Curated annotation (Swiss-Prot):
Subunit and partners: Monomer.
Originating organism: Ehrlichia canis (strain Jake)
Name under which the protein is recorded: Isoleucine--tRNA ligase
Function, as annotated: Catalyzes the attachment of isoleucine to tRNA(Ile). As IleRS can inadvertently accommodate and process structurally similar amino acids such as valine, to avoid such errors it has two additional distinct tRNA(Ile)-dependent editing activities. One activity is designated as 'pretransfer' editing and involves the hydrolysis of activated Val-AMP. The other activity is designated 'posttransfer' editing and involves deacylation of mischarged Val-tRNA(Ile).
Catalytic activity, EC: 6.1.1.5
GO function term, MF aspect, one: zinc ion binding
Positions occupied by motif 'KMSKS' region: 647-651
NCBIfam families: ileS
Length: 1120
């Protein structure tokens, strides 16, 4: 029955069994309602509580700082975490999601300094540590409310009520316990070393902090080539009239020259000399060219010394100090040999300042430079005479209180005055900067406490191989290589707001003693508690300065005068975040059994730079404390940048506020955009500010899902249908129904396979969220553009037949299953549809389980059905491509297509019902098949001569001859016979040739499916008058339907239509196809007028003009 008659039966009798929306969906509004539903009904809590206590999925939520608003990187990480947690919950696991806050460290301290108007450690101490730390405590959660708003709006489920904070005493006690454990294992030591130092923050940094993000930036430094005057002439060098010998040294840090204590050369470098006036300058032969160019440019006359100078002749020679400050230091100011000296941009001789370079420090320590007798406590004041702000102390009297970077020019001027400056340059190089202040770092000697990572490095490398890294190249690449070069970790910070190091030392070096504590009160026999040695009744807070007040006499001092005082340092906040697996549970003081049963975590994710941050510190502490990896599966995602590849920043104004995006497009669209992008696996997401990419997701993903739901509800409500879930394929007979159910089942299997971690032999790492998203998109494209479109007439039939009921049940079933499996990836829109389609055995889709599809068993006919559907959709695409190439509109019917098969039985044996589908889809009247492809195309053979030349180089000329004579054929094993079997011939391997099929008709093209050639399709493009008139009729129908949509008519509205045209062909077409037009457009009345003046009440009509034709269409709602 036609749709007009069908709808005429139900007009004014419609009642909604399924909730539906009219007009365009307002997705942000829909999302707000869903969020409200979740909150009012405690859906998140129920989703956790309803799962089996003994079937847990452990997920670690890394703690962010709450002193700034979340950005797109946080949202991306949150979307991944939430998606995996939702998926595992629907898979039957209990997934607790406890939010955490990183409260200590530089971010909090710097914010407080800014708010209090103070700067530097001295200013803080003057202000008062207690008041400063109280301000840190109050300000650190400044944006926690905004964080919760962003997290809630992105539809991320986390437990804020039971959150953990690194500043809580329970968390801090677990930190000091872990330090105590490391101490007992011999993995903690105190040492003076060279560390990267932020003078702006007045604290050292970990070596891995200088490798995170874009810590290295381009910096232009002033370099100087300095002449150090030897106190004695080198051995075996005798030159008349040379009064002094000088060593040329190049440095990029002139400010370190006042602290020079030695020079270093290499045994593997040849040196030479050049005489200028009465001075010989000595340098590496590799520097000679630069030396000569400089002399030429500055008109400096020189004479080359004509013999090589061996390093042996230079070693142990002494030289005059450049400055007076440390001239009396013993065992200094001599030339040493070192392996780290290489020829490069410098002179082959390195200036050694042991307080400002790691190699320098190690070399001088080995050589006992400076030699200090007795107490060595003043070593740092000699080798590193700067204060916390990188200003010289009074040891460097001429530059006292000057920042080291501000002294370069003055130092160079002094060297010029002393005739010790040979050359000055500007040098552009990558230089580490403070990740917090963007200021260039310095490297300086400091006393710090270290975790001896090098002791456990081999075990970390071993455990790393047990982790499922995604992408998998992280294992042996970025993280694996980082572990191979792991260094000991400086964990102490000479700051204020942090967990204090639980170390007490004697204040008298004559009576040394160190006490390390691991708990506040005595809990374990093997863990030293503070209450054993101190009165802790007044200590309610482990922070400074309260814990600093715990002082006692040194038991090892018989005089009773020295005291045990806590070292002033606090922990690196990376140590705290690396401790979160156990510290959030107050392990081992509480939850001991729980932690030990469920460690390590099943899953973790952060952006890829955390391989040198949080992932790394987790790994160190987990290996050292528990001999286990901290997690089993890890996604390392990339970063979100603007379209120019620049970091998103307020200064550049190159991004939109995420909340504005949510309110305009919805968070599901943003979620799916990110989850379906390669950013999940370490790539960069270039996000446009205007929201173009998110609109694409709305159009291509969200709306198709909504449209399938909307189509079902409209017609199910019209028919008063209550659809049922299909549980077995044998309930269905229609090939379209069986096909879409099979596609649904296969899609669900694909999503399961993408998400589930399998054994490594399967090459499936699991957690392939992008692939799962692609499968969802692909299915709804098939559902809307194939199944629903192909089956519309079944839904439009007036009688409720079994076929019609099957169509409803089929559509209802695939929506039901796909909504469930899509819920983790699109949690809000799936919930909205779930509530409207009465799938409510469960209160929420997120309280349901992933689809159980075990009852659906695909037989051979189903598999063949899928293959045929795949085949005809493939052919459709090629035919439509030919139409597009030749500008033949799809609505224009054509006479026939011819399909030429190439070794494809499925093509030649295509059943009639599939042929009919194909013809309808491409709007063609008939189809024919041929088995001889040579009628329409020919193969072109190309030989891979580089490969053949390796195997049979002496036969290449004969191969060319046989090829030109077209003497070849394909063998069954995909090899090629060149020549004839009876005469000269060669067997060519499949990697030694390629075949290309060339068609001989512009209206033909090859058919390729899954990279296999199936044949050629030819489209007959000749048009008869009958075909032309039918095409015009279809154009008119489309014009009317577009006008209905543009003017927001309901799908059931009847209309009156008037066509205005003087075109005889158009009029003939309308007369011929009038009944078809009326049926397709719900027209009650239909008329043709040649003159506009003949149309009565024209103002009541909506007017549309057909493109490329002198035709106007007028329509209005019918009142009959």
């Amino acid at each position: 029955m036609c749709i007009v008659k069908y709808l005429s039966l139900i007009i004014n009798t419609m009642t909604e069994h399924y909730s539906q929306l009219t007009g365009e969906p307002d997705f942000p509004s829909i999302e707000e309602n869903v969020l409200k539903f979740w909150q009012e009904n405690n859906i998140f809590k129920k989703s956790v509580d309803n799962r089996d206590e003994n079937k847990r999925f452990i997920f670690y939520d890394g703690p962010p700082f709450a002193n700034g608003l979340p950005h797109y990187g946080h949202l991306l990480t949150g979307f991944i975490k939430d998606t995996v947690a939702r998926y595992k919950t629907m898979a039957g696991f209990k997934v607790e999601r406890r939010f955490g806050w990183d409260c200590h460290g530089l971010p909090a301290e710097m914010l407080s300094e800014k708010e209090l108007g103070i700067s530097g450690k001295l200013a803080i101490e003057k202000f008062g540590i207690e008041k400063f730390n109280n301000h840190c405590r109050n300000s650190v959660m400044k944006f926690s409310k905004e964080w919760k708003q962003y997290v809630d709006r992105q539809a991320r489920w986390v437990d804020f009520e039971n959150d953990y904070k690194t500043m809580n005493s329970s968390f801090m006690e677990s930190i000091i316990w872990s330090f105590h454990e490391l101490w007992n294992k011999g993995l903690i030591y105190e040492s003076i070393k060279i560390v990267p130092y932020s003078w702006a923050c007045q604290t050292p940094l970990s070596n891995f902090e200088t490798r995170m993000d874009n810590a290295y930036r381009e910096k232009t430094s002033k370099t100087v080539t300095v002449a150090f005057e030897l106190l004695e002439s080198p051995k075996f060098i005798t030159v008349e009239n040379v009064k002094t010998y000088k060593i040329l040294v190049w440095t990029t840090t002139p400010w370190t020259l006042p602290c020079n204590l030695a020079l270093a050369i290499s045994k593997n470098i040849k040196y030479c000399g050049a005489i200028i006036k009465h001075e010989m300058l000595i340098f590496a032969t590799g520097y000679l060219k630069i030396f000569q160019e400089h002399c030429k440019k500055n008109n400096i006359e020189y004479q080359l010394y004509n013999q090589d100078i061996s390093s042996v002749n230079l070693e142990d020679l002494h030289y005059k100090p450049l400055f007076k400050y440390f001239a009396d230091v013993k065992n200094a100011f001599k030339i040493l040999t070192a392996d780290f000296v290489v020829e490069g941009e410098g002179t082959g001789i390195v200036h050694i300042a042991p307080g400002f370079g790691e190699d320098d420090f190690i070399l001088c320590k080995m050589q006992d430079i400076p030699h200090i007798e007795g107490d060595t406590s003043n070593l740092l004041s000699i080798i590193c005479p700067i204060d916390d702000g990188a200003k010289f102390t009074d040891k460097i009297s001429d530059f006292k209180n000057m920042h080291v970077f501000d002294t370069n020019d003055q130092i160079i001027n002094i060297l010029k005055q002393k005739n010790l400056c040979f050359k000055i340059d500007q040098y552009l190089h990558n230089y580490p900067h403070c990740w917090r202040t963007d200021t260039p770092l310095i490297y300086r000697a400091m006393s710090s406490w270290y975790v001896e990572v090098t002791k456990i490095k081999d075990k970390m490398i071993e455990l790393n191989k047990t982790v499922n890294w995604i992408p998998n190249h992280i294992c042996n690449g970025q993280f694996g290589k980082w572990l191979e070069n792991a260094k000991d970790w400086a964990i102490s910070r000479n700051r204020f707001w942090g967990t204090p190091l639980p170390v007490w030392k004697s204040d008298n070096p004559n009576y040394p003693r160190i006490d390390v504590y691991g708990s506040i009160r005595k809990v374990f026999n093997n863990v030293k508690a503070l209450e054993e040695d101190f009165d802790i009744s007044s200590i309610n807070d482990l922070h400074r300065p309260y814990i600093d007040n715990l002082v006692r006499p040194n038991p090892d001092d018989p005089t009773g005068k020295s005291m045990m005082r806590r070292v002033s340092d606090v922990f690196d906040c990376w140590f705290e975040s690396g401790s979160m697996p156990y510290a959030q549970l107050h392990y081992p003081f509480e939850n001991k059994e729980f932690f030990e049963n469920y460690f390590p975590a099943d899953f973790i994710t952060e952006y890829i730079a955390q391989t040198r941050g949080w992932f790394y510190t987790l790994f160190i502490l987990s290996t050292a404390l528990f001999n286990k990896p901290p997690f089993i599966n890890c996604i390392c995602h990339g970063v979100v940048l603007d379209t120019q590849g620049q970091k998103l920043s307020k200064r550049l104004n190159n991004y939109a506020d995420p909340m504005e995006i949510f309110n305009q497009y919805g968070s599901d669209a943003m979620r799916f955009l990110m989850l379906s992008h390669t950013v999940l696996y370490g790539g960069d997401l270039l996000l446009d500010k205007e929201g173009v990419m998110i609109k694409d997701v709305l159009r291509n993903v969200i709306k198709p899902i909504w449209n399938s739901y909307n189509f079902f509800t409209i017609y199910a409500n019209i028919d008063h249908i209550t659809a049922e879930i299909i549980t077995e394929l044998n309930e269905l007979s229609n090939i379209m129904d069986r096909y879409i159910i099979c596609e649904c089942i296969n899609t669900i299997h694909s999503i399961f396979n993408a998400m589930e971690e399998l054994d490594q032999c399967s090459n499936n790492l699991g957690y392939n969220i992008k692939l799962a998203c692609n499968n969802i998109t692909k299915f709804f494209e098939i559902l809307n553009n194939w199944y629903i479109r192909r089956c519309r007439s079944r839904f439009w039939s007036s009688e409720i037949t079994q076929d019609k009921q099957d169509a409803y049940n089929t559509l209802y079933t695939v929506i039901y299953y796909m909504i469930k499996v899509s819920a983790p990836f699109l949690p809000i829109i799936t919930e909205a549809i779930w509530q409207r389609l009465n799938f409510q055995k469960e209160e929420s889709v997120h309280l349901s389980s992933l689809p159980n599809i075990s009852n659906f068993i695909l037989n051979n006919e189903d598999k063949q059905n899928i293959q045929y559907m795949k085949l005809i959709t493939c052919i459709c695409n090629y035919v439509l491509s030919i139409r597009s190439t030749h500008n033949i509109r799809i609505r224009q019917p054509l006479n026939k297509i011819v399909i030429y098969s190439h070794n494809c039985p499925d093509l030649l044996n295509l059943p009639a019902e599939y042929q009919n589908i194909l013809l309808e889809e491409v709007n063609v009247k008939s189809i024919s098949f041929k088995s001889d492809i040579s009628d329409i195309a020919s193969f072109q053979l190309k030989l891979n001569f580089p490969e053949l030349g390796k195997r049979i180089p002496d036969k290449v000329k004969r191969l060319i001859f046989l090829l030109k004579n077209d003497q070849w054929k394909i063998l069954e094993n995909d090899k090629l016979l060149l020549g004839t079997i009876e005469a000269e011939h060669y067997v060519i391997n499949n990697n030694e040739y390629t075949l290309a099929l060339k068609v001989h008709n512009d209206f033909a093209c090859t058919i390729n499916l899954d990279q296999h050639l199936l044949g050629v399709v030819l489209l007959d493009n000749e048009l008869s008058n009958e075909l032309i008139m039918e095409g015009i009729a279809r154009d008119i129908i489309r014009t009317i339907q577009h006008s209905r949509k543009d003017n927001k008519f309901n799908i059931s509205d009847k209309i009156d239509v008037i066509i205005h045209t003087k075109d005889n062909i158009v009029k003939d077409s309308i007369k011929t196809w009038s009944q078809y037009i009326i049926q397709q457009t719900l027209s009650t009345s239909f008329a043709i007028h040649e003159e506009i003046s003949d149309i009565q009440d024209i103002n009541e009509y909506y007017k549309t003009t057909m493109k490329d034709k002198e035709v106007s269409v007028f329509l209005k709602k019918s009142h009959t």
